[in-house]
């Protein structure tokens, strides 16, 4: 069974890969509308990854896994 932390870490990786793929698609296209669409999608996936990363940090804090410098 997967822990919440593992699930969130997997989502961060997945969303980051989706954002990177959309960025590549945007760069590869000659059509300005297609570029804008893929760029917007990449931004959304990046925001999702950031939110999941924030959730991961909160889970670490709650579980006591975070060490503060």
What are these regions (language model features)?
Residues 1-16:
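Short, charge/polar-rich alpha-helical segments
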Residues 10, 21, 28, 32-69:
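Short, charge-rich amphipathic interface segments used for partner binding and complex assembly
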Residues 16, 20-23:
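Short amphipathic alpha-helical segments
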């Amino acid at each position: 069974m997967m822990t919440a932390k593992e699930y969130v870490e997997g989502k961060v990786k997945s969303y980051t890969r989706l954002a990177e793929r959309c960025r590549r698609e945007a760069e590869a296209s000659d059509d300005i509308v297609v570029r804008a669409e893929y760029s917007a999608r990449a931004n959304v996936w990046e925001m999702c990854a950031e939110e999941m990363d924030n959730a991961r940090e909160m889970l670490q804090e709650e579980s006591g896994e975070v060490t503060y410098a």
